[in-house]
Amino acid sequence: MQISDAWIRKVFTGRGDVTVEVELTVEDSVTGDVLVTRAAAPAGASRGAHEVLYFPEGGVDAALAAFEKLVAPEIVGLDVTEPYSTDGKLEEVDGTQRFEKIGGAVAIATSFAAAEAGAASLGVPLYSFIGGAYARRLPLPLGNVIGGGKHSRGLGPDIQEFLAMPLNPPDIYTAVYTNVEIHKRVLKYILKVDTSFTGGKNDEGAWTPRISSTTALKILREAAREVSGELGVEVGIGVDVAASSLWNGEKYVYKNEGVERDPREQFEFIAKLIEEYDLVYVEDPFHEEDFQSFAELRDRFKDRLIVGDDLFVTNPERIKKGGKIGAATGVIIKPDQIGTLLRAHQAVSAAREFGMRVIVSHRSGDTEYKTLAHIAVGFGAEVIKTGIMGGERTAKLNELIRIGDYLGKWATITQIRIH
């Protein structure tokens, strides 16, 4: 089936930021059958310096104009059943590595909508269109429980995310339920240390108390142990430090805690957190150019997930650079960081080349679309990072549960062993 019409409009993310939604009409020239698919671009609050440009110069209106003038005329007539044909055309039309002419938001929304159209045209689920007939492994959900940093307007802990993840759940429903229960249980512990807390949540639905990073970890550890004991599911906890947002060029500035740490002090601080709180997952512990510190931490904690987000920005070349020195055991994959599903797939391939685990991730300003769940299964990701609470978060989690039901006895779920 071929694209017969292409539209774009301004819509909003769950954070209230303006983004773009692309709508494609595809038609079978023989039968006359018509399908319509849509997709919107998510938006991040803390963006890596090497990500594609979200909007071209001139903002969202310039993005709309670029789509109507440059993109739509070129993609009409393309066969959506040919994987990545639209993505290739987007790169050809823009002609820059960072999608500076049309913007990454236009590129990823178009890429997603075309993939949805391809799957619908063939009558297969999107995860099968992306990953093939044997895509059947479900990822472990990694959820943001307590929030700080930029996602919480700088009012909570300096570390951006305090995370929970079931490590050995029997199925995807139990995995999601485990995180939900931890999120609920954490509130009880927060109120014990911050009696004035009124239940505020950040962009990703995480609690935002005014507590220190170490207090947040103590609370999360206790809640995770409690839920783990009740459900019989091993639970790991972790952090997304988002260290690039703390780095001033010389030191890591923890404003709320009144502490500045040089690179060596930052390394020892992170190592101490891993040891003291038995962290299984550590994302972006150092700034986005410090590949060597990542490699040193990974070498010291070989059995933990040391993960790069801003370090790699879903860029195959940066992933290869890190892979050659053993900078990480896991890679965050955010398709919008690189602009198309084709490029994101290339990033996954680069990660696999160096034995890294794949964590498909949402953005803090996400949308109600459930595409990410299918991408995670299609890419064979071990982990999906998509929050716990909030409509744009549960949309992905509920879709994973549906995929699990659809796959039935053929479904498997990742198991992670630590220690």
UniProtKB/Swiss-Prot annotation:
Q: Where does (2R)-2-phosphoglycerate bind?
A: 160, 334, 363-364, 385
**Pathway, per Swiss-Prot/TrEMBL?**
Carbohydrate degradation; glycolysis; pyruvate from D-glyceraldehyde 3-phosphate: step 4/5
Could you tell me where this protein is found in the cell? Cytoplasm; Secreted; Cell surface
Which species is listed as the source? Answer: Pyrobaculum aerophilum (strain ATCC 51768 / DSM 7523 / JCM 9630 / CIP 104966 / NBRC 100827 / IM2)
Free-text remark on how the cofactor is bound: Binds a second Mg(2+) ion via substrate during catalysis.
InterPro entries, per the entry: Enolase, Enolase-like_C_sf, Enolase-like_N, Enolase_C, Enolase_CS, Enolase_N
- Please name the taxonomic classification of the source: Archaea, Thermoproteota, Thermoprotei, Thermoproteales, Thermoproteaceae
Main localization is cytoplasm
Question: Looking at the keywords, is ATP-binding present?
Answer: no
Q: In the UniProt record, what gene is named as encoding this protein?
A: eno
> Which GO terms of the molecular function aspect are on file?
magnesium ion binding; phosphopyruvate hydratase activity
For biological process, the GO terms are:
glycolytic process
According to its UniProt record, the EC number is 4.2.1.11
What name does this protein carry? Enolase
